[in-house]
Amino acid sequence: MYDYLVVGAGISSAVFVHEALKVGKTCLVIDKRDHIAGNVFCEEIEGINVHKYGAHIFHTSIRRVWDYVNQFAEFNNYINSPVAIYKDELYNLPFNMNTFAQMWDDVRTPAQAKAKIAEQVAEAGIGEPSNLEEQALSLVGRDVYEKLIKGYTEKQWGRDCKDLPASIIKRLPCRFRFDNNYFNDRWQGIPMGGYTSMVQRMFGDVEIRLNTEYRDLIAAQPDIAKRVIYCGPIDEYYDYKLGRLEYRSLRFESELLDEENHQGNAVVNYTEREVPWTRIIEHKHFEYGEQPKTVITREYPADWQPGDEPYYPINDERNTALYEHYEKLAADEGRVIFAGRLGGYKYYDMDKAIDAAFDLVEQELGVKIG
């Protein structure tokens, strides 16, 4: 009998397993996919680490997280500086002085940019915003909204901005300096050699069974472990008996191109509604690759259906209430602990997922990290 059966071979599981092995616990890791590393899995194609489930850029201001991951990989100095394309016009992201100078010919200083935005906000004349469109207009005015927010957001959610709640956008940060660094965090980069190698080092020599369903294993060996760390969907664990939690999903189309450099940037967003994909990722630029070929991936938002890969929890009133009911069931579990993005029905950046795993390690193993 193992001390722990760990369901899911992603980054949260890897942290827990690494620490459990250090204190002498035995673990079995299973995953229904045919690979480890969850959604940060990278596949090498023509010497390029391809992010199979969308772009993953590591960024954090949590020192203990940064120190921890650097035990398992050397990180490069990649800075996320995406570009947006709207009707063949190029704009830097996030919204900063470069963006405003590209958008308005008469804007060159922070004072001019602030005045232009204030003028357009006043023209919109929004009192209390009743939907996402009104919220955005009340924050940044019509030009930024129409060119960089409206179409992209409608593709992401599959609904018109007038039909989306204002609460989705609580604020729209505008930087009144020439700074294209998307994140504000202290540390940022990509693990050299890809995320899969990093996660493999975290797991060490633990036993991992891929293409393995939790239900099948437990049906055959109900007493295989004393405790279960379950990083799968919490509603699936309970056979959806209270109802299904909802997600937004994604679809990816990757293409190997016989050219050295396709778009000159790792991430290019397409913000007009008429272009069906939301962005194109050119993976080699994450690691400053100079390979003779390149791999690009078009990313399409998708309505989630049972059986699809769940990406983003829809934390609206209905789903939040349903998750809380499942959480009450989970509180009565004797040996099962729910963890990770799917177990907790919560979207995590990678650093927050790792930090939450640290808390689990402390709670379950009595080991404090950092």
Question: Whereabouts are the PLM-identified features?
Answer:
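Active-site/ligand-binding neighborhood in enzyme catalytic cores
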Residues: 87-91, 97-226, 231
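Dinucleotide-binding Rossmann-like beta1-alpha1 core, especially the glycine-rich loop
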Residues: 46-122
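Short hydrophobic core segments
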Residues: 5-7, 30, 223-235
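C-terminal segments that line or cap access tunnels to active or ligand-binding sites in enzymes
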Residues: 236-370
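Short, solvent-exposed loop/turn segments at secondary-structure junctions
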Residues: 11-12, 34-35, 98, 154, ...
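Short, well-ordered alpha-helix to beta-strand connector turns
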Residues: 2, 24, 206, 224-226, ...
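Glycine-rich FAD pyrophosphate-binding loop
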Residues: 21-46
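N-terminal Rossmann-like FAD-binding beta1-loop-alpha1 element of flavoenzymes
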Residues: 2-29, 361-364
